[in-house]
Amino acid sequence: MTFSVKSPILGFEGIKNVEITKIDDFFVKMQDKDGDTSFTMINPYSLRNYEFDIPTYYQDLMQISDKSELQVYNMLVISSPIEESSVNFMAPIVCNTTNMTLSQVILDPVNYPQYSQAEKISTLLKKK
């Protein structure tokens, strides 16, 4: 699926269009359509209870309504073994599959103290 990036991906502000490809039930690959940059992301719901409110700014930017179909992913920093990889829960990638738009939503740490920028998968697996 190809998405138009409506809010820049931190550190990769030049990326305007991405292709998201499912790897398996847990992981997806996000590839810059106009370059060589790619990211591995994870379905956060496979690891933990993960809830947040999408700020109005992003809702307007992505034209999110009650009827919008959304998917949420989190960026991974891959390590070996995979359980040592870290997940950024503070900046989810929100995909509106209704209009094929995407934004990286930056969460306020004051409102979401339970999430961090670099939480190891192994820590999350122990909590389950």
From Swiss-Prot:
It comes from the Bacteria. SUPFAM superfamilies: BH3618-like. Pfam families: FliW (PF02623). One of its GO terms (biological process) is bacterial-type flagellum assembly. InterPro entries: Flagellar_assembly_factor_FliW, Flagellar_assmbl_FliW_dom_sf. Keywords: Bacterial flagellum biogenesis, Chaperone, Cytoplasm, Translation regulation. It is found in: Cytoplasm. The keyword Ligase does not apply. One of its GO terms (cellular component) is cytoplasm. The keyword Chaperone applies. Belongs to the FliW family. Acts as an anti-CsrA protein, binds CsrA and prevents it from repressing translation of its target genes, one of which is flagellin. Binds to flagellin and participates in the assembly of the flagellum. This is Flagellar assembly factor FliW. The gene is fliW.
